[in-house]
Each structure stands twice: as structure tokens, then as C-alpha cells.
């Protein structure tokens, strides 16, 4: 007793507008390696001059050394790589790129013979293998042409933090964000239909955020898409850790044995992916310009959200649906609900336009019992919506102010930045796939989430993601360090008509759990950073546009009314200077009772006592909304 549904996930305290406080700019220096040609000149000698015996020995030694280098497997064969001179495979030892795992040739042969037939490979490109492994490739696939591909290593100052900075200047006020350069593989003059790459996999929790590992996979993808013609190109990785799941997808995985992964990528789709920035160091979509337009395949695209263990978000989901329709989108709306959501509440969701699908909850094995994050891995069920090609997931506590259908044209995972190198999962593009769902489930016992929730877990799986402007998931939040000018700028964005923001994400206490008269975040000091009367009024404007039939799903329980009054009294005692505690509440919901203890004021006499339970505040379940009454919607 004495607590309200105010649990806030960690992500809600980490707004996309990180730049307002930190403004960390990554200094990038461009380095260019200059190769100095190795010249070996022998001057003509006069017919009258004779070499001494010592000079003759020296000449023979140099010649023998040159011949050995020329035929060494460590260098390029110029007949295999047009326009390229002899180069070393490693270009010098770089520990970032070295992989010490053993190559299991039985697994390689098993996969290639079963899935393709090893004799089908006319040309095999080899990346990041040592001399012994190259010899084994030639021995096991002796009918193929083998090309040893050289990849210049990334500069030492290219770090994961420079590829995925916490903040970039999206508005280009002081600089144009530019990603660090990662060298590409040069397309050889011969046809390749298999590109084999050996990937490093560091020990430790952060193995998936590895510049060399990303570089090798991105380079392989770029080379695969560079070939002309309508023939398949296979990509084979040797690694103990799974490859980037949204660059080379599990739907394209045709064979996996041990540490061998064989893909047949969709080259058209992959070609679009490699055109995107390599990290979140640049926007994947423009900040400004003409209104973004996307047609796509509407029947195979949907907005989706999820409700589990909390009917208090039903009102928020209904308002979110209303905002999507007001933005002009006609895409399907799909909501996943568990068994805790009553038939009454499901009928309200359906009346609002949501296609309701019941799911079985997924427990977070690392969460405490009854904790806020105990069941939030249920979000993984989104990947089982395989009757859709693309999903735009939205949290149930936001409003769509402008049409964002164009995000259906973006790949998985497209999202706004959160903090550090991470994305905010409150709005994200998902590509449903049963095998991706299985990937998520396979690792829930081993992968640690930074915030204990689904957002942290997804950030460990999908480390390669695409940044969109924060206006597409703008958090209702003011940093303590925000100057008044910055606060006023945000307030202007919250209330702008026509809207400037695409999405407004309501953090802190939710608008429908406050009285509509003002934002109740003002009455608790720990929530002041989320308080905005302008944003609050914006939400209620959408609420009032909903069919009146749906307003009943936003009524307040008696316990919540008591909580709001308790917080107001505490604000009065503390004499908060904003003065919201002085405002007389006129919200008509104050006098509407939906449970069996309507005298909420009497609850305040015992507020906070530990021997109280919620049992006596049982809320009767009203009858479902009749579908016959929906004709007016």
C-alpha cells in the first residue's frame, strides 16, 4: 500500500537527447598508409668488369630470396587479382584481427557438400587465414581458383565508441557527422562464388562490440554485393561466436556445424545494408529535407506493442492507436497480451483498432521475483509475428505525432540512440523471424543485460544498429543540467502545431494516471525531470479525439486517486516552488468510481501502513465492449 504503478525502466532515464548534457565529440584523424615500393636495381656492368667472388655470392642470395618471395602463398598472385601487386596477407601482425580457433575441415566439407556440393565453387576468396589454412583450402577444394584477399586493417584510433558515439550533431549546427573509414576488399578480376572469412571472437562479455570483427563481416558483405551477374555468392564464416544477426540473417543461414557458418545472402537486400553508415556515427535517415515517403508492402507491415502483467497500460495503448490513425497511417496494429489482461480490456483494445494476440509470457531468468523486469523478455515474441515482413515496435506510453510509415523501409534494427553505444528500444524496426526468436531464446541464460531488461539484452544481440533522428523517439525528459533555453526549446517541441516531433515518448508518471489538470510529475521531486504541462496537454488532446466509448478505459482507480492526493499533500508540505499543488482538480474522473472502495479519501488515513494489502481494493471486471457498438468508430 502506498505505492503507485510508477516503476520506470532504466531506459526511461536515459533520453535520446544525450547531447544536451554531454556533447561528446569524437575527434577523428584520417590516416593514410603510404606504401613504399621495394626497388631492386642492378646496374649494368661493363664487359671489362668482373664480379668478385663475394659479389657473386651476394647476387645469388638476393635472387634466391626474390624467387622464394614471388612464389610464397603469403602474397597475392597477380594473375588472381587484376591490378594488384604482391602483398602480404596480414600486412603485419595486428592482434585485433587474429583468430586462434582451429579450423574444422570436416565441418566445412560436411556443410559445403550437403548444401551446395563442393565442386560447385569456381572461385573461393579467402580472408584472414594463415598460410597453413590457405594450403588446406587449396587441398580440399582443388578444382576451384583460390584468391587470397587482402584487407587493410582499421586504423588504431577507430574504436567501437567512435563508430557508435553517444552523441552526434544531428542538426549539423557545428559539424557534419562523419563515420570513421573502414577499408574495403578490392574486387578481384576473377569470379568468386564463395567468400570465406575467419573471424576473431574475444573472450569476455563484450565480444560482439569488436571493430575488427565488424570490419571483416562488413567487408565480406561489400565484396559479395560488388559482383555483377545473377549468380549466388556464398559467405562462410569460421567463428565461435554467432555472426552479426541483422547483417547476415538466420533466414539466409543454410548450414551451421560447430564454428562454421554458411550463408547464401539476398544480395539485393545486402547491397542496401552496406550502403548504410557502418555505425551510428551518422544518421541512417536525414534530419531535414522533403517529407519522407514510403509505399512498401502495406499488408506485410504493422505497428506492434505488447502488454504483459500490467493492465494500467491499456489506456496508453488505446491512445497510441488513436495517434497512429490521426497521423494518417493505415497499417495493421498488432498488440501482444498475456493472460493477465482481462477480456474487458482486450475488447477495448480491439475497439481501438488493435489486433489482439494472446501470448505466453517469457520470464527473464536474471530478474527477481515480482520485479518490474520479471516478464519483459516477453517482447521477444515480436519476432514470431512472421505473417509480417516488417514491424515498427512502439512502447505503449508514446504518441505518434507525424506519420512514420517510412521506417518500414529501414532494416532491423533501426532506432534512436540511448546512452553510450546503445539504442533505445521504445521505437525500433524489427524483421520477424522464428529463427531470430530462437537466437534470442538460446542465449537468455548467458547474456547479461546492462539494465536487467529487454532493452539491454537486445543491445547485446544487435550491436550493429542504425541511428534515426531523436525526433522519431523524443523523450519527455529534462536533464538537471539543462539551461532554461534548452528547456524552453524542448517545451516548444512538445507543443508545436503542426507537430515538429514524429514521436513523443512519455517518461515518468503517465498522463492517464495523473489528473488531466496538470502533469502530476510535478508533485514528486524524483519525477520533476519528467514534468511538462505542455506535453501533458498534448496527450489529453489525443485522448479527447478518441471515440467516447473508449474513455472508460482511462478512468482512475480509487487507489490511484488516493496516491495522487498523497503526492499533492507532500508537495504542499515541501512547498514546491512550481506551485502545481495549489491547482484545484476539476478532472471529471475524480468523481467516477470503478471499484468497490469509492471513498478514496478514507484510504489516506492508513496510507503507507505495512499491514495493508491490495485485496480489499479489488476492481470488478466490467462486461466486454459489444462489437455491435463499434459501427460508429
Which residues does each PLM region occupy?
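A glycosyltransferase accessory/donor-loop signature
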Residues: 2-313, 319, 444-633
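Glycosyltransferase specificity loop/lid
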Residues: 80, 337-346
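Conserved beta-strand termini and adjacent loop/short-helix elements that scaffold enzyme active sites
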Residues: 149-151, 238, 336-338, 357-361, ...
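Amphipathic alpha-helical interface elements that mediate macromolecular binding in regulatory proteins
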Residues: 219, 315-318, 322, 347, ...
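Hydrophobic/aromatic residues located in beta-strands of well-ordered beta-sheets
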Residues: 235, 333-334
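Short, acidic, metal-binding catalytic loop of nucleotide-sugar glycosyltransferases
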Residues: 323-331
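Short active-site oxyanion
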Residues: 331-333, 389-390
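GT-A fold catalytic core of metal-dependent nucleotide-sugar glycosyltransferases
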Residues: 343, 350-367, 371-434
Amino acid at each position: 500500500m502506498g505505492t503507485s504503478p510508477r516503476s520506470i525502466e532504466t531506459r526511461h532515464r536515459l533520453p535520446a537527447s544525450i547531447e544536451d548534457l554531454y556533447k561528446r565529440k569524437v575527434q577523428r584523424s584520417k590516416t593514410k598508409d603510404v606504401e613504399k615500393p621495394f626497388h631492386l636495381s642492378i646496374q649494368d656492368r661493363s664487359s671489362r668488369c668482373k664480379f668478385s667472388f663475394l659479389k657473386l655470392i651476394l647476387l645469388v642470395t638476393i635472387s634466391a630470396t626474390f624467387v622464394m618471395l614471388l612464389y610464397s602463398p603469403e602474397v597475392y598472385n597477380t594473375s588472381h587479382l587484376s591490378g594488384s601487386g604482391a602483398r602480404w596477407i596480414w600486412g603485419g601482425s595486428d592482434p585485433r584481427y587474429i583468430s586462434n580457433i582451429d579450423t574444422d575441415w570436416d565441418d566445412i566439407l560436411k556443410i559445403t557438400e550437403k548444401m551446395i556440393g563442393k565442386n560447385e565453387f569456381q572461385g573461393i576468396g579467402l580472408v584472414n587465414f594463415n598460410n597453413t589454412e590457405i594450403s588446406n583450402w587449396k587441398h580440399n577444394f582443388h578444382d576451384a581458383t583460390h584468391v587470397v584477399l587482402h584487407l587493410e586493417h582499421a586504423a588504431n584510433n577507430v574504436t567501437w565508441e567512435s563508430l557508435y558515439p553517444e552523441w552526434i550533431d544531428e542538426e549539423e549546427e557545428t559539424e557534419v557527422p562523419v563515420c570513421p573509414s573502414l577499408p574495403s576488399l578490392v574486387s578481384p578480376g576473377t569470379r568468386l562464388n564463395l567468400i570465406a572469412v575467419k573471424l576473431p571472437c574475444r573472450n569476455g562479455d563484450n565480444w560482439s562490440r569488436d571493430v575488427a570483427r565488424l570490419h571483416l563481416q562488413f567487408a565480406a558483405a561489400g565484396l559479395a554485393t560488388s559482383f555483377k551477374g545473377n549468380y549466388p555468392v556464398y559467405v562462410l564464416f569460421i567463428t565461435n561466436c554467432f555472426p552479426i544477426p541483422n547483417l547476415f540473417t538466420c533466414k539466409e543461414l543454410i548450414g551451421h556445424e560447430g564454428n562454421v557458418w554458411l550463408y547464401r545472402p539476398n544480395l539485393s537486400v545486402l547491397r542496401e545494408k552496406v550502403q548504410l553508415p557502418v555505425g551510428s556515427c551518422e544518421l541512417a535517415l536525414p534530419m531535414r529535407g522533403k517529407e519522407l515517403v514510403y509505399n512498401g508492402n502495406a499488408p506485410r507491415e504493422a505497428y506492434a506493442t505488447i502488454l504483459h502483467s500490467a493492465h494500467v497500460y491499456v489506456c496508453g495503448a488505446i491512445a497510441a492507436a488513436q495517434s497512429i490513425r490521426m497521423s494518417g497511417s493505415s497499417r495493421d496494429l498488432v498488440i501482444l497480451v498475456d493472460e493477465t489482461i482481462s477480456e474487458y480490456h482486450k475488447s477495448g483494445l480491439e475497439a481501438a483498432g488493435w489486433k489482439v494476440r494472446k501470448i505466453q509470457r517469457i520470464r527473464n531468468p536474471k530478474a527477481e521475483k515480482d520485479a518490474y523486469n520479471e516478464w519483459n523478455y516477453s517482447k521477444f515474441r515480436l519476432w514470431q509475428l512472421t505473417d509480417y515482413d516488417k514491424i515498427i515496435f512502439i512502447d505503449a506510453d508514446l504518441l505518434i505525432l507525424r506519420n512514420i510509415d517510412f521506417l518500414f523501409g529501414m532494416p532491423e534494427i533501426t532506432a534512436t540512440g540511448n546512452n553510450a553505444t546503445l539504442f533505445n528500444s521504445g521505437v525500433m524496426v524489427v524483421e520477424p523471424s522464428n529463427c531470430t526468436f530462437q537466437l534470442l531464446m538460446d542465449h537468455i541464460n548467458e547474456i547479461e543485460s546492462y539494465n536487467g531488461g529487454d532493452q539491454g539484452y537486445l543491445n547485446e544481440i544487435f550491436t550493429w544498429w542504425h541511428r534515426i533522428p531523436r525526433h522519431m523517439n523524443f523523450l519527455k525528459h529534462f536533464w538537471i543540467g539543462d539551461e532554461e533555453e534548452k528547456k524552453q526549446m524542448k517545451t516548444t517541441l512538445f507543443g508545436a502545431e503542426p507537430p515538429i516531433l514524429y514521436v513523443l515518448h512519455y517518461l515518468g508518471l503517465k498522463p492517464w494516471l495523473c489528473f488531466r489538470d496538470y502533469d502530476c510529475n510535478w508533485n514528486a521531486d524524483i519525477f520533476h525531470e519528467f514534468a511538462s504541462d505542455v506535453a501533458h496537454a498534448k496527450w489529453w488532446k489525443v485522448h479527447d479525439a478518441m471515440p467516447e466509448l473508449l474513455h472508460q478505459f482511462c478512468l482512475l482507480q480509487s487507489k490511484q486517486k488516493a496516491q495522487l492526493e498523497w503526492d499533492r499533500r507532500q508537495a504542499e508540505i515541501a512547498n514546491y516552488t512550481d506551485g502545481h499543488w495549489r491547482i484545484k482538480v476539476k478532472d471529471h474522473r475524480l468523481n467516477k468510481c470503478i471499484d468497490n472502495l469509492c471513498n478514496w479519501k478514507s484510504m489516506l488515513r492508513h496510507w503507507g501502513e505495512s499491514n495493508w494489502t491490495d485485496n480489499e481494493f479489488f476492481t470488478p471486471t466490467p462486461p466486454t465492449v459489444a462489437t455491435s457498438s463499434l459501427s460508429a468508430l
